[in-house]
Regions:
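Conserved helix-turn-beta segment immediately C-terminal to the redox Cys motif
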Residues: 33, 51-71, 85
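Short pre-active-site segment immediately N-terminal to redox-active cysteine/selenocysteine motifs
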Residues: 33-35, 39-43, 109
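Conserved redox-active cysteine motifs that mediate thiol-disulfide chemistry
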Residues: 39-56
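Thiol-based oxidoreductase modules, predominantly thioredoxin-like and allied folds used
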Residues: 65-78, 90-98
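Short, internal strand/loop/helix patches
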Residues: 84-118
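Thiol-/selenol-based redox modules, centered on thioredoxin-like
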Residues: 118-145
Length: 145
């Protein structure tokens, strides 16, 4: 029954993104682009609010200069898929159930996002997501484009 429900969820899910294993993540392959790197989990309410905004960024900025990479930290794949069944994602998602990448980035809260310039340098870090700050977030992106 559990497998049936998961399969059903995958079929009706609004997910547009590809989901990858964290071991497939290669930030260097995006060199030359500004990267918005976002860590999230299914239980995180602010994470749900950030997804529509991140989707809008992909439509706003040129794909050859900007990309979004998100990393899900749910231990259980089912929790991630359940979340993605409710919230549309137009960007690629990497699943890091052990938190190995999160540990390297020394996360302090959820969600946490990093703005990485086209040379691969982390230039901004945001803990949490606040809709009242989206203009600021976008200015920071535009300064790097």
């Amino acid at each position: 029954m559990k497998k049936f429900l998961l399969l059903l969820l995958l079929v009706i899910s609004p997910v547009r993104a590809e989901i990858y294993d964290i071991n497939q993540l290669d930030l260097k392959s995006h060199q030359g682009k500004v990267i918005y790197l976002d860590f999230w989990a299914s239980w995180c309410k602010p994470c749900q609010k950030s997804f529509p905004w991140m989707n809008s960024l992909l439509a706003k900025y040129p794909a050859d200069k900007f990309t979004i990479i998100t990393i899900n930290l749910d231990a259980e794949t089912e929790a991630m898929h359940y979340f993605l069944g409710k919230v549309k994602a137009d960007f690629d998602i990497y699943h890091d159930p052990s938190g190995q990448i999160a540990e390297q980035f020394e996360l302090e809260g959820m969600p946490t996002s990093y703005l990485i310039d086209s040379n691969g340098k982390v230039v901004k870090k945001h803990i949490g997501f606040y809709t009242k700050k989206v203009d600021q977030y976008e200015r920071e992106i535009e300064e790097l484009l």
